[in-house]
């Protein structure tokens, strides 16, 4: 059983609120979960402390048991200083493709 810490959407249409839950990865996003760890309200200002509420003791316990955080929850945990998130790196993104290189060289020659 692969256990993840992720966001489950709640709230109404156009006014989302997310519960931070521990769930089996096979369960639906908003479906069954094992335990609720907190909530996230994206409509609140970023500097408001009520925007994100997490029970850090429970989070640390689930991480110790092997639960994997989702990308968004990993950002929250990195900000809180609980778990360091490795930076994403794509060095080939800025390298032009072969065709573009050939076109640029041809244009430079003449």
From Swiss-Prot:
GO terms under cellular component:
cytoplasm; small ribosomal subunit
- Spell out the Pfam families in the cross-references: Ribosomal_S16
Going by the entry's taxonomy, the superkingdom of the source organism is recorded as: Bacteria
Gene Ontology biological-process entries: translation
Keyword Acyltransferase present in the record's keywords: the answer is no
Which Gene3D superfamilies is this protein grouped with?
A: 3.30.1320.10
Q: Which InterPro entries match?
A: Ribosomal_bS16 (IPR000307), Ribosomal_bS16_dom_sf (IPR023803)
Quote one Gene Ontology molecular function term: structural constituent of ribosome
In the record, the note on similarity to other proteins reads: Belongs to the bacterial ribosomal protein bS16 family.
Record's protein name: Small ribosomal subunit protein bS16
Species per Swiss-Prot/TrEMBL record: Bradyrhizobium sp. (strain ORS 278)
């Amino acid at each position: 059983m692969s256990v993840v810490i992720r966001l489950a959407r709640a709230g109404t249409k156009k006014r989302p609120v997310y519960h931070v839950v521990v769930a089996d990865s096979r369960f639906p996003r908003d479906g069954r979960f094992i335990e609720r760890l907190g909530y996230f309200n994206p409509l609140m200002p970023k500097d408001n402390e009520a925007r994100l509420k997490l029970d850090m003791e429970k989070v640390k316990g689930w991480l110790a048991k092997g639960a994997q955080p989702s990308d968004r929850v990993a950002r929250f945990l990195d900000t809180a200083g609980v778990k360091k998130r490795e930076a994403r790196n794509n060095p080939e993104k800025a390298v032009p493709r072969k065709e573009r290189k050939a076109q640029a060289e041809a244009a430079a020659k003449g």
